[in-house]
Amino acid sequence: MKLSKDFKEIKGDASFRKFYRNKKKNSIIVFANKEKPKNLLIYDSINKILIKNNLIAPKLLSQNYENNYIEIQDLGNKTIYQIFLKNKKNQYFIFKKIINVLNKIQLIKDKKIKNFKNIFYKIEDYKNKILFDEAKLFSYWYIPKKLNKKKIRIFNVKFSIEIKQLLSKLNFKNDTFVHRDFHVSNLVVNSKNQIGLIDNQDALIGNKAYDLASLIDDVRFKTSNSLKVKVYNYYLKTNKKINADKFKNDFEILSVLRNLKIIGIFMRLAVRDKKTKYLKLIPYAWKMIDNRLAKNKDLNSLKLLLASNFPKFINK
């Protein structure tokens, strides 16, 4: 792909995409020759839905789908993750602003929109099968590197049973817009000091607790348990109609499943894609899993399975 000298490559994420910033035009080229529909067509569709609902997301400036790229508005390079690294004083205040954005996201009713090819895109439901398959990334990629062959077979059978049981215990319906990667690295502060959303292509209609679990138990950014509790309580305070007990149950189950998935993804990145930098984040993912397992009796059986195989990370 040939670009003018005005475009500078941006350090990429864990996906197959490449990004190029043009500061003169205030734009970014998103290039994707793998998983093209998701990374270009669906990405733009989700952005359109967010913008339609008065949220800040990158607008499409131009598209060249045949040559594997789109040009989008540049929201800037100041992520909340970067702000937090520089200043730890106002984190709770900023988290409250993030929760206000999340509340706005969760009011979205649109499920369908026309993409730039003039074809309707409909957001899919976050079905239990998807959650199950995501959790199985842990057993598919991480387990073979950590257990012997005999243990692998036994673990995988038991693990599948545990995950299915946990999914059957979720209370909330799939009726809420879920970003799926709602964390401080994907939240950008623009020139007007407003919070914008990036990396939006994975959105589904799912459980209300998922994005909050993604934000609070974020593997890339360590927060104290006391801050986690404060942010969680602020969400409940701004959503008084929610059944707190049922919500807590779903939050804890989804947090554990998400971080098991993430461990699997990080091992896959290392083994398949030779991207080893994410391996150092795995111990913190384990720490958050252990923290949530200790708080929900419905997770006891999974806790025992993990503790018997990974006593270094999970307390019995």
Regions found by a protein language model. Give the residues of each.
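Active-site activation/catalytic loop segments of kinase-like enzymes and analogous catalytic loops
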Residues: 136-146, 208-242, 256-273, 285-292
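ATP-binding pocket architecture of kinase catalytic cores
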Residues: 20-133, 171-172
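ATP/Mg2+ or Mg2+-diphosphate-binding catalytic cores
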Residues: 264-316
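Acidic, serine/threonine- and proline-rich low-complexity regulatory regions
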Residues: 242-252
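Active-site acidic catalytic loop and adjacent metal/ATP-binding pocket
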Residues: 16-23, 105-106, 164-212, 219-223
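A short beta-turn/loop motif at secondary-structure boundaries
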Residues: 10-14, 62-65, 254-255
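ATP-binding glycine-rich phosphate-binding loop
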Residues: 2-21
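An alpha-helical support segment within catalytic cores of ATP-dependent transferases
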Residues: 1, 110, 117-118, 122, ...
